[in-house]
A protein has these predicted regions:
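Bacterial N-terminal signal peptides
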Residues: 1-10
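Intrinsically disordered, low-complexity serine/threonine-rich segments
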Residues: 10-16
Length: 210
């Protein structure tokens, strides 16, 4: 069994999107992945990906950038970023022919460097899962966070793609007393510091035993 872990160091209903996300194929020979897709810039890279015809493509985080990252409880700017991507011809053509999986990082989570202290994290999760077509029956829909596993093929040639969530449960970063001299953050000595959170760690341990 091959294991691929993906992490990065959906609108109110799917029917509002002008795209559909294809499910993963039954077998794989090629996997594409990328991140940091700034919608304000050229999206021609998506046409290149479409032409390459990967069996599945993984958006690994920062898949959209809200124009105004704020604590807006309605996530208006983030919703608009998703809508713009949905309407982009390059993305529409890609999503029509290439199966897509996704995880997020801070900008498509909703706020730069945000973690578990982001007040809109649950609403952002709903946006993400709707936009990227996470199946209603997927176990990730029944728990906090977007982490999930996707299994493709049959043993002994099965592939297990593990999509981790490094934002929803991440504890706050340590900020220095004098940022200009030491940078935005400093190493933490807190033994409770976490990136995945306890529940995701326990889940990952069990998944890796399979």
């Amino acid at each position: 069994v091959t294991v691929l872990l993906m992490s990065a160091i959906s609108l109110s209903s799917a029917s509002q999107h002008s795209h559909a996300i294809l499910p993963p194929p039954s077998s794989l020979q090629s996997i594409g992945f990328g991140s940091c897709l700034e919608g304000q810039k050229s999206l021609s890279i998506l046409s290149t990906i479409t032409a390459a015809k990967p069996d599945v493509f993984i958006f690994a985080g920062d898949n959209v950038y809200a124009e105004n990252e704020t604590l807006d409880p309605k996530l208006a700017s983030l919703r608009e970023a998703y809508q713009q991507l949905s309407e982009a011809p390059e993305f529409q053509a890609m999503s029509e022919s290439v199966p897509i999986l996704a995880t997020w990082d801070d900008h498509d989570y909703g706020l730069n460097d945000a973690g578990q202290d982001f007040p809109q994290r649950q609403a952002s999760e709903q946006l993400f899962e709707s936009f990227w077509g996470v199946p209603a029956a997927d176990p990730s829909r029944t728990r906090p966070g977007i982490y999930r596993v996707v299994r493709i093929g049959q043993a002994p040639q099965a592939i297990q793609i593990i999509l981790l969530d490094t934002r929803f449960f991440r504890t706050s970063l340590s900020k220095p007393w004098i940022p200009p001299l030491t940078g935005r953050y400093t190493p933490s000595e807190d033994p409770l510091q976490s990136m995945l959170g306890e529940s995701q760690w326990l889940w990952l341990q069990e998944i890796l035993k399979e």
